[in-house]
Amino acid sequence: GADFYSWG
């Protein structure tokens, strides 16, 4: 998901 650490 579009998180601070995970964009995938």
Swiss-Prot record:
Entry's localization field: Secreted
Gene Ontology CC entries for this record: extracellular region
Claim: DNA damage is one of the keywords in the record: no
Gene Ontology biological process: neuropeptide signaling pathway
Keywords in alphabetical order: Amidation, Neuropeptide, Secreted
Domain of life of the organism encoding this protein: Eukaryota
Signal sequence range: none
Residues carrying Glycine amide: 8
Function per UniProt: This cephalomyotropic peptide stimulates contractile activity of cockroach protodeum (hindgut).
Protein name (record): Leucokinin-8
